[in-house]
Amino acid sequence: MNKEISTADILSGGESYSGISAVEKNAKAMMKVYNAIKTSFGPLGLDKMCVDSAGEVSITNDGATILQNMLIDDPAAKILVDLATQQDHEVGDGTTSVVLIAVSLIEKGAKLIASGVHPSVVVSGYKMAFNECVQFIKKSMSKSTLNLGSKALRNVVETSISSKVISSESEVFCGIVIDALKCIESVDENRKNMYPIEDINILKHPGGSMKESFLHQGYALNCSLASNFMKRQVKKPKILCIDFGLQKYKNPLTVSIVVDDPNKLEDIRKKELEITRRQIKTIIDSGANVVLTTRGIDDMCTKLLVEADVVGIRRCKKEDLLVIAKATGTSLVSSIADISGADSISSLGFADKFEVVQIGEEECVLINGLKKKMASIILRGANCQLLDEMQRSVHDAVCVLKRTLESNSVVPGGGAVECALSLMLEKFAFTVNSKEHVAIHRYAESLLSIPKILSTNAGLDSNELVANLLSSQSREMANSSGSKFLGIDVTSGKIQDNFEFGIIEPSVNKMKSLKAATEAAISILRINEVIILPPDQSKN
């Protein structure tokens, strides 16, 4: 008689979890992450101090940053880190909420599976619930920004930064973010407005206060002049971007020269100086009056450039020079020697104005009038940790506004969408005759985790507030002329029409968050067995 071989028989020294044990193990690992980040959610959420192995400190309430700084060993929990990172790359905002919804869905689904419901039924129910949510958001919850007026854009940015460190200077940063998007606005072949946010450069300058941050229409980079005797402003500059240093030429170490007369050593030094002067002369003869290099400029080359009235900027980042070269209509030059070996420079970049300004204790290069639409946001703040968090906050706000402008569709914030979807799904579940109706009920319950955590982090009674919100929305939905956009104002603890009070966010962000959270939950709930090999077998 053939004996059935189990996973435990195959593994020697490894671990195996199957069935309900596997689901519960994954759910427990997820809850640890959930509890770690839920207090950072919302306008009144708290910050986390993350210290890495090198002792570097970062203070943030950004979900993706917190998760990336956590040491997570559990493979299932690592999916949440990937989820938040992907949300940050694709959407830019909502990294915390997408993880909270995903974990809530996994927890509810795990309980259903433990009670005897088959995982396929839970997965099918979640898919049905998600599809209904998307349809409901499109048909009933969304409004066009064209109908709401220009104030809607400011409201979107204010809602995004309300939970960020820059919320205390929301007037300043709303203006900066909106103007930055207008600077880079372009039209594609379908006559649709596009906002390539990669053309927005964000610089950090320690010192000063947050309200000293400003927008520059053009490109800015943190670099300094090679000499204080060089001009700090050039109109109609001819720009040369080079990827080599302007330093005294020296023969490579692999070259050996044998001399029988000590006086010839001086001839070798003179020849090296002549080669260096010839290179600088080639640059000057090209007509360039601004030279940007990724390397250094030594004293001799600096003297020659100053005498020729050429501005030299040293130690620029190569990525910055690639952007500047493209925006000025040239390319990054890696060598001034052409194919024949002669020194020559073929092309220069052009702009309207080149300027070096002092910001705090550092210098900043500003270039205006580029061939390509570009914008730079220069941030000021007390210390590097604050500036890092400001950069993340501005990036999130820029991404949110881009989504709003490109989709022209917004939904109310403050838990209004989640509560409305929960009520809709509860009604929808009663129309489903199959087993999936149980999973749809649990999906509806999971969505309520967002308004509950919002109110808890604001120091309010979450159960009472969410119950009042659900009853208010239910009454308004029953009344066809009533408002279905009721949400929570966490600062006052009141229930209000969040569209009317300007608490809004892009509808595409909400739908992408739901999609990502649902897909992550389904991928975890479908896991029937966890096999952990011992370290020596894993290496083999």
Curated annotation (Swiss-Prot):
<keyword id="KW-0547">Nucleotide-binding</keyword>
<dbReference type="InterPro" id="IPR027413">
    <property type="entry name" value="GROEL-like_equatorial_sf"/>
</dbReference>
<keyword id="KW-0963">Cytoplasm</keyword>
<dbReference type="InterPro" id="IPR012715">
    <property type="entry name" value="Chap_CCT_alpha"/>
</dbReference>
<dbReference type="GO" id="GO:0051082">
    <property type="term" value="F:unfolded protein binding"/>
</dbReference>
<dbReference type="GO" id="GO:0005832">
    <property type="term" value="C:chaperonin-containing T-complex"/>
</dbReference>
<dbReference type="InterPro" id="IPR027409">
    <property type="entry name" value="GroEL-like_apical_dom_sf"/>
</dbReference>
<dbReference type="InterPro" id="IPR027410">
    <property type="entry name" value="TCP-1-like_intermed_sf"/>
</dbReference>
<keyword id="KW-0067">ATP-binding</keyword>
<dbReference type="GO" id="GO:0016887">
    <property type="term" value="F:ATP hydrolysis activity"/>
</dbReference>
<comment type="function">
    <text>Molecular chaperone; assists the folding of proteins upon ATP hydrolysis.</text>
</comment>
<dbReference type="InterPro" id="IPR002423">
    <property type="entry name" value="Cpn60/GroEL/TCP-1"/>
</dbReference>
<dbReference type="GO" id="GO:0005524">
    <property type="term" value="F:ATP binding"/>
</dbReference>
<keyword id="KW-0143">Chaperone</keyword>
<protein>
    <recommendedName>
        <fullName>T-complex protein 1 subunit alpha</fullName>
    </recommendedName>
</protein>
<dbReference type="InterPro" id="IPR002194">
    <property type="entry name" value="Chaperonin_TCP-1_CS"/>
</dbReference>
<comment type="subunit">
    <text>Component of the T-complex protein 1 (TCP1) complex.</text>
</comment>
<comment type="similarity">
    <text>Belongs to the TCP-1 chaperonin family.</text>
</comment>
<dbReference type="Pfam" id="PF00118">
    <property type="entry name" value="Cpn60_TCP1"/>
</dbReference>
<dbReference type="InterPro" id="IPR017998">
    <property type="entry name" value="Chaperone_TCP-1"/>
</dbReference>
<dbReference type="InterPro" id="IPR053374">
    <property type="entry name" value="TCP-1_chaperonin"/>
</dbReference>
<dbReference type="GO" id="GO:0140662">
    <property type="term" value="F:ATP-dependent protein folding chaperone"/>
</dbReference>
